[in-house]
Each structure stands twice: as structure tokens, then as C-alpha cells.
């Protein structure tokens, strides 16, 4: 909370917010860019909204947390919240507007109900906007130059169950063409009423790698195509430069863990259509980082990415920004298997053992929960996020009707020997060992 953390942040932070014109906004050289990036991360830490420590939360819990944070700050002068429609099940879908500038910007998050990382980040940005000191130059200059509208939770029914689809079972991000769902119509109506120059399509993805042999992707970026030819018109070109600005900032924090999302044209998707409708749109996909199962570090990095992007729009530096940091990113590669156990022997119910590799796919690859069997057999050439050599060890599965079934729930113990009482090396899922 600000009350305890803000005063103790010291002269360094205070100096960042009291810098003269053009220091936080403007093209000011590498040293000041680094200083500005540090300031954005300080904002992410100092204004983190309590009550959102886990990435699964409901519509009511989210708005209660946001309301508490904004209420403490008496945000009514700086922040406007309005209902823009209701979901299939009647939950309120709200838009938040900040700033009063001539350039309209639209951000929307959690159109997939189980993709909540940026939803948390938007709460933190709103908290900063409402509670930062009156002489906070960054906020004041953003407010003068941009009008920012956020829809933090577009699919509250999906969020209620923490599932991708809405209450009709529809992927809202595949309804931009038909507009059959209320959630899709709401987003389209807001876009049409604002006619935003820039859009941010905020999502989460599974466990992908940066290139075929790269690191786990923390964040993937995309300037979506507006047509089958994937042409680079002026609207998409601006999104490309904006993606480059974000990529350069993130590379400083998680080098090697940024990737470029596939830009094949998807005629039903909102990002592609936003581009086609004239809004320069960037897709930000929050992936996974080691030791970050609740995506709290990615929450922090989304604050950095969004504030970096907004600042580049506001100060005009975007117009001359290089696309190279985006163009040079490795491709975002989907990995079929989360884990492969290689080189061991699988012990069946009759005690016989067989030289079989075992692939495992998690229902939640980030938290590594819900393990299920993938392919079984010779997987020497299979790609996985993690491959564990279990040569000389024995895999003892709990069998489903005497069989190992692809897609079946994994309950497996790795032991030193074929004897079911031999020493335990590992259990999947992990439990207290014998």
C-alpha cells in the first residue's frame, strides 16, 4: 500500500516524479530511458492493488479490490468508471476512462476468462493514476495528451469459472465478424464510439518458447495483420513501431524471453479487425516465467510495457521508433509437451517393464497442475519445455483399467527399481514422498 511504502521510497523516486518537462516524456537518451523504465517498475511495485495476489479471481472480487484502492485515493476527479453493457449472465462490463487528451487509446483485457494477468496490471495503473501525487509529471502529461479507455474484464462470466469461453461457450475473440455475443458487441460499440488511434489487446498464452530452442516466453508481441496478404499499411506500421518500443523495454528485464506471435490473418479475431478498422493495435500475450505460477512478475512487466507504450505515444517518440526490436524477435513456438521422461522403463500391472518414454501435458502449464499423458513410446525427437533423463529408473503408473491412456490423468511414481516398494525418486503430481 502507498501509505507505508511510498514515503520510504526515498529521494530517487521523488526525483523521478518531480523532473522538469521532457524528462519523463520525450526523447532524452539512453540514461534517461533507463531511469524512466526504473520509474515505471517503481510504479508497478508501489501501487500494486492488494487482493489480486492470485490470477484466479471473480468479477466481484476484482472490482471490490479496485474499488477499495481507488476509494482510498478519492479517485473521482481523475478516474471515470461507467457500465458499457452486460454479459450473457448479466454481469456488469465496465469501461474506465482516464486522461483528457486529443489522442484516444483503448485497452481491453480478459476477453478470455482465464487470462487475467493484464487485468491485474490495469488495476495497478489505475491505482497509480488515482493516488499519485498531484505534481506527478508523468501522469499529468499523459492526461493532457491521451484519453485512455480500459475495459479490464470483458468476459466476466468466463472469469467467474476461470475458463476461456463466455457463458454461451463462445470464444469472444472469434466473434469480431458476426458479433453474436453481447461481449463482442460491447467491445465493437466502444471501439466505434471512441474511434481510438491505438489499441492494446491483452491476453495470456500457455508455455511457449522463443524460437525452436529458446527460453520459456514471458511475453509475446504481435502487430496483427489486417488482411490475408499481411500487408504493412500505415495503421499496422504504427503498431509495428509500438511493438518495437515495448520489446526494447522488456528485453532489458527478461532478455531472451520475448517472442513474436504468428501474424497469420484471422478474419474472426478482434486484433486483426481492429487493425482493419483503423486502430493501430498491439497484442500482448503474457506467457510464463520460472517460479512465477501466479504471474505476479508478469503483472509487473505488463505495467512496464503499457506505460512505456503510452509514453511513446504521448511524447511523439513513437513516430521515429525503430521496428527492429520487434522484427528481430524469435518466433513464439508452441510446444506440444510440457515434460518428457526419457530413457526409463515403464512397469505395467503384471510387473513387466518396457523401455518407453512418457510425455506429460499439464492442464495449467504455468502452475504445473493437472498432468495428463501425452504420447508414449520413442520420444527421442520430441520437443518439450522440460526433458528429464530417467535412464536406469522405473516409472510406476497408476493404470486406468490396466492401461496407460493418452489424455488420462497422470499418477506416476519414479522409483529406483521395478519393485513397487523400491526407493522413490519423484512423484507426478508431486506429493510428500515416502
Question: What are these language model-derived features?
Answer:
Residues 1-2, 28:
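Short hydrophobic transmembrane-like helices used for membrane targeting/insertion
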Residues 9-23:
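Bacterial N-terminal signal peptides
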Residues 28, 84, 132-136:
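Catalytic-site microenvironment of enzymes
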Residues 28-58, 194, 219-434:
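C-terminal accessory segments enriched in acidic
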Residues 54-103:
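Soluble metallo-hydrolase cores and metallopeptidase-like ectodomains found primarily
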Residues 81, 95, 150, 199, ...:
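Conserved beta-strand scaffold positions in the cores of enzyme catalytic domains, especially
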Residues 102-111, 115-259, 275:
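Active-site/substrate-binding loop(s) of hydrolase catalytic cores
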Amino acid at each position: 500500500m502507498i501509505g507505508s511504502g511510498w514515503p520510504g521510497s526515498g529521494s530517487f523516486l521523488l526525483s523521478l516524479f518531480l523532473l522538469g518537462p521532457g524528462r519523463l516524456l520525450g526523447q532524452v537518451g539512453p540514461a534517461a530511458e533507463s531511469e524512466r523504465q526504473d520509474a515505471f517498475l517503481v510504479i508497478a511495485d508501489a501501487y500494486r492493488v492488494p487482493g489480486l495476489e492470485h490470477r484466479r479471481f471473480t468479477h466481484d472480487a476484482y472490482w471490490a479490490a479496485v474499488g477499495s484502492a481507488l476509494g482510498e485515493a478519492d479517485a473521482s476527479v481523475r478516474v471515470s468508471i461507467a457500465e458499457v453493457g452486460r454479459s450473457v449472465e448479466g454481469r456488469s462490463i465496465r469501461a474506465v476512462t482516464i486522461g483528457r487528451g486529443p489522442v484516444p487509446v483503448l485497452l481491453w483485457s480478459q476477453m478470455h476468462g482465464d487470462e487475467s494477468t493484464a487485468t491485474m496490471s490495469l488495476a495497478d495503473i489505475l491505482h497509480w493514476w488515482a493516488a499519485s501525487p498531484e505534481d506527478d509529471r508523468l501522469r499529468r502529461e499523459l492526461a493532457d495528451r491521451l484519453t485512455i479507455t480500459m475495459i479490464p474484464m470483458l468476459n466476466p462470466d468466463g472469469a467467474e469459472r476461470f475458463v476461456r469461453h463466455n457463458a454461451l461457450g463462445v470464444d469472444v475473440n472469434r466473434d469480431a465478424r458476426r458479433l453474436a455475443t453481447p461481449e463482442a458487441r460491447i467491445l465493437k460499440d466502444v471501439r466505434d464510439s471512441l474511434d481510438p488511434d491505438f489499441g492494446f489487446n491483452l491476453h495470456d498464452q500457455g508455455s511457449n518458447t522463443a524460437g525452436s530452442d529458446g527460453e520459456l516466453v514471458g511475453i509475446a508481441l504481435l502487430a496483427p495483420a489486417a488482411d490475408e496478404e499481411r500487408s504493412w499499411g500505415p495503421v499496422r506500421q504504427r503498431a509495428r513501431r509500438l511493438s518495437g518500443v515495448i520489446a526494447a523495454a522488456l528485453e532489458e528485464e527478461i532478455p531472451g524471453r520475448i517472442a513474436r506471435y504468428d501474424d497469420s490473418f484471422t478474419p474472426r479475431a478482434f486484433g486483426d479487425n481492429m487493425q482493419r478498422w483503423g486502430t493501430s493495435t498491439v497484442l500482448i500475450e503474457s506467457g510464463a516465467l520460472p517460479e512465477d505460477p501466479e504471474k505476479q512478475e508478469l503483472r509487473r512487466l505488463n505495467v512496464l510495457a503499457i506505460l512505456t507504450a503510452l509514453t511513446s505515444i504521448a511524447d511523439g517518440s513513437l513516430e521515429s521508433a525503430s521496428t527492429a526490436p520487434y522484427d528481430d524477435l524469435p518466433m513464439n513456438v508452441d510446444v506440444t509437451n510440457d515434460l518428457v521422461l526419457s530413457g526409463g522403463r515403464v512397469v505395467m500391472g503384471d510387473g513387466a517393464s518396457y523401455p518407453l518414454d512418457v510425455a506429460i501435458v499439464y492442464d495449467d502449464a504455468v502452475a504445473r497442475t493437472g498432468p495428463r499423458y501425452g504420447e508414449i513410446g520413442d520420444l527421442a525427437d520430441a520437443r518439450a519445455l522440460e526433458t528429464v533423463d530417467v535412464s536406469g529408473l522405473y516409472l510406476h503408473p497408476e493404470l486406468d483399467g490396466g492401461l496407460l491412456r493418452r489424455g488420462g490423468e497422470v499418477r506416476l511414481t519414479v522409483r529406483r527399481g521395478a519393485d513397487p516398494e523400491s526407493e522413490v525418486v519423484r512423484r507426478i503430481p508431486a506429493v510428500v514422498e515416502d
